[in-house]
């Protein structure tokens, strides 16, 4: 069976399923089903294939300048929030669920990579990070700025349209032109790729810098003196030892939350803005604040999810207080899937939480659990409320979609946004006769490629990392899965589908060699 014969499986499957869910069933709304707790993680996938893709009220006019807020959570698995099937007895996410109730929830949203830096690069530029010098893993704490200052980003595009722009939260895309010297001005940096304001954790939660960045300098830097032995991080390792106020892990999320909300409160109606807010939860170390500690039966990891939800609520409250909600598009998602590593995660799973929902694998891996993430879009009156969609999309599509959203033509495919597809019609709930994305390439922490097209997922199985971890050896060989019938990637069907393998392998090579995948 060829790819062409299966290309439209999603739409065909939706049509078949919508004809007769099951004999004797009494139809109920998705909202009522969620209220009754009828959808687990796998059930939500099924529900979205039963026709919950409603038409949008209206299309934005070219040149509209709505405010835009992107909330990119960290390591949040598909099944970690209520509107994606998390058990409400273990975790409650009323603010994220509010976004889903007031907006549109996607069940097949994917990150470009199953780790942090590459996804953040792809989100802002519309280009897969494996096209750069970073072929596996993430940027280290001293890495130079990874986005070329000449490369268009969402922020630089919007800034040219008169938007005020800010990044608050985890940056993890490097500073300066060579090895970062945190005692000096951190330029080039976010300001050189379109952001007017920055308040950031330089790399990761619990990273070796131990500090915040505000503007172009370490916040509160007193001198250029370094004392590496003075401070230890959560792993017991020496910090860089910067002579500046040190972050307290339990206070990082409240600090970022307040900075994001405060920046929003400074905005004035009629002057468009773009906030890229990247909270550090639910990345390790698991450090809920005093306000959420002990709030979840799933333990500290559940508390950490609550911390994220509380932060989302503060952002939404700031928009409400300023009367900006109706004029603001909010996109909530995650940089990759959840992570199994850690005592707190293990305790949460032992309690019954399923952070990756029905998917195999987690962060770092080539399996679906590494890429499938929550993805919710809200824009009152434009994005249809309380709807869901199973269109295959990528976070890399954010650039092209926002460009269409504000009426800006994309640059030539060889110049920018090389891997970004316009999925605005999916955001708006408009009917589509064929998939918006004919294919999608994903990439693991070890540099393993996979390509999806229709129901098929082809894993090339060749790690770029010189010494990949033995624990992930089952990813390091070619394999083919039919996700339409095997969402858990349990049965390799390459031997019975040689034509599909040949087509997908050729597609992957073509997209790599020509320098772009956008069509």
Predicted regions, residues:
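Formylglycine-dependent sulfatase
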Residues: 2-7, 13, 19-479, 485-519
């Amino acid at each position: 069976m060829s790819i062409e014969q299966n290309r439209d499986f999603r739409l065909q499957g939706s049509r078949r399923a919508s004809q007769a869910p099951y004999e004797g069933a009494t139809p109920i709304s998705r909202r009522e089903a969620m209220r009754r707790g009828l959808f687990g993680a796998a059930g939500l996938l099924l529900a979205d294939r039963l026709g919950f893709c409603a038409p949008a009220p209206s299309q934005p006019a070219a040149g509209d300048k709505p405010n835009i807020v992107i909330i990119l959570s960290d390591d949040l698995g598909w099944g970690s929030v209520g509107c994606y099937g998390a058990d409400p007895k273990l975790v409650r996410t009323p603010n994220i669920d509010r976004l889903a109730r007031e907006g549109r929830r996607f069940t097949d949203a994917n990150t470009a990579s199953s780790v942090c830096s590459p996804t953040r690069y792809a989100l802002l530029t519309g280009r897969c990070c494996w096209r750069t010098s970073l072929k596996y893993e993430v940027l280290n704490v001293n890495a130079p700025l990874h986005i070329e200052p000449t490369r268009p980003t969402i922020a630089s595009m919007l800034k040219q349209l008169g938007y005020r722009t800010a990044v608050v939260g985890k940056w993890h895309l490097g500073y300066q032109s060579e090895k970062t010297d945190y005692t000096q001005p951190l330029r080039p940096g976010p300001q050189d790729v379109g952001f007017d304001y920055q308040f950031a954790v330089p790399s990761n939660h619990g990273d070796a810098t131990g500090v915040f960045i505000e503007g172009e300098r370490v916040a509160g830097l007193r001198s250029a003196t370094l004392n590496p032995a003075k401070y230890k991080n959560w792993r017991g390792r020496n910090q860089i030892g910067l002579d500046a106020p040190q972050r307290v892990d339990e206070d990082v999320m409240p600090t970022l939350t307040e900075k994001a909300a405060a920046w929003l409160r400074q905005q004035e109606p009629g002057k468009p803005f773009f906030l890229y807010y990247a909270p550090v939860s639910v990345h390790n170390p698991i450090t809920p604040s005093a306000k959420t500690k002990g709030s979840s039966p799933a333990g500290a990891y559940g508390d950490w999810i609550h911390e994220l939800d509380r932060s989302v609520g503060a952002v939404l409250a700031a928009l409400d207080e300023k009367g900006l909600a109706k004029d603001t598009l909010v996109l909530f998602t995650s940089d990759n899937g959840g992570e199994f590593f850690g005592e707190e995660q293990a305790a949460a799973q032992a309690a019954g939480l399923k952070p990756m929902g029905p998917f195999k694998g987690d962060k770092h891996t080539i399996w679906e659990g590494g890429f499938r993430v929550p993805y919710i879009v809200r824009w009152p009156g434009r994005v249809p409320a309380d709807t869901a969609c199973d269109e295959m999309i990528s976070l890399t599509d954010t650039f092209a979609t926002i460009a269409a959203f504000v009426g800006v033509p994309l640059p030539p495919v060889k110049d920018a946004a090389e891997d970004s597809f316009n999925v605005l019609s999916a955001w708006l709930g408009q009917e589509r006769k064929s998939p918006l994305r004919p294919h999608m390439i994903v990439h693991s922490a070890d540099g393993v490629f996979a390509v999806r097209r229709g129901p098929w997922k082809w894993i090339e199985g060749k790690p770029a990392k010189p010494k990949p971890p033995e624990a992930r050896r089952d990813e390091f060989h070619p394999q083919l899965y039919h996700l339409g019938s095997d969402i858990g990637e349990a049965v390799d069907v390459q031997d019975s589908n040689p034509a599909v393998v040949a087509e997908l392998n050729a597609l992957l090579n073509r997209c790599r060699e020509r320098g772009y995948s956008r069509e």
